[in-house]
Amino acid sequence: LETMTDIERREMFSFYYPGEALLGLALVANHFKSDKKLQVLVREQSRPALDWIVNERPKYYSDLFTALPSDAWLMQAIEEWANDPDFRNEDYINFVFNDAKEMIKRTYARDDSPYIDFEGGMYYDYGDHYYPDGARCEGLVAAYYLAKKLEKYDLADEFLKACRLAAKCQYQLYINEKVNYGHKNPAKSVNAIKFKATRQWVRVD
């Protein structure tokens, strides 16, 4: 990475994979108890990575961040790391809670959306077609677990309410016999999940 230009770094920028890697490392640190040496090494190496990704990355790549947060993997990673009291860093915790609150803020409500079936879906700019975003919902769930873990029960209730609303929105993507009549092979598509509300593409993930 040190030999790459800033343009090359930007082209390789991803919200997903660093958080996913840190979640994997957290699982190793917390659960692979048969290898104490590895656990110590993982903790030592992960702390500066978390510090950089939470506090420094936004300074270098602020223009790549969108209004609707995209870092659900990192939210899950921080929730898992919080099982270790030494990793209950205020900056990490605030990152999760602030991103979750921003997701909720950019979620259509029944009495505040262009169409009633947008309820529970997310948007970048108000008026967008809604995004029934399961990946971001994983970040919301992580925020709920983290709030419970830290005994912030009012906050946990707020996040759980948002999770339930988002889950109802996700159900609209479920393909059953009532909605697959136009498919070439309805028997094959039944019980699948659509990629988007307005597309009949099936998600294989």
Functional labels for PLM-detected ranges:
Residues 59-60, 76, 80-92, 96, ...:
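Glycine- and acidic/polar-rich repeat regions and solenoidal domains
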Residues 105-205:
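CBM-like carbohydrate-recognition segments
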Residues 49-58, 64-75, 81:
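Beta-propeller domains
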